[in-house]
């Protein structure tokens, strides 16, 4: 997910994307806690995607 793609989305779409990413992060964390997560790099990728979405939302709020 690129920041350029995110900037093209509306605030409502970004909020929906954020909720989706937070749910995915929760599921990955539960898998990691129970020892079922094989691809641990996904946790880092989702965390950074959440940060990107929040950054773009902040930019749009200021503009």
Curated annotation (Swiss-Prot):
One Pfam family from the record: Ribosomal_L29
Claim: Nucleotide-binding is one of the keywords in the record: no
Keywords for this protein: Ribonucleoprotein, Ribosomal protein
GO biological process, alphabetically ordered: translation
Any Gene Ontology CC annotation: cytosolic large ribosomal subunit
GO molecular function, one term: structural constituent of ribosome
Family: Belongs to the universal ribosomal protein uL29 family.
HAMAP family: Ribosomal_uL29 (MF_00374)
UniProt name for this protein: Large ribosomal subunit protein uL29
Gene that this sequence comes from: rpmC
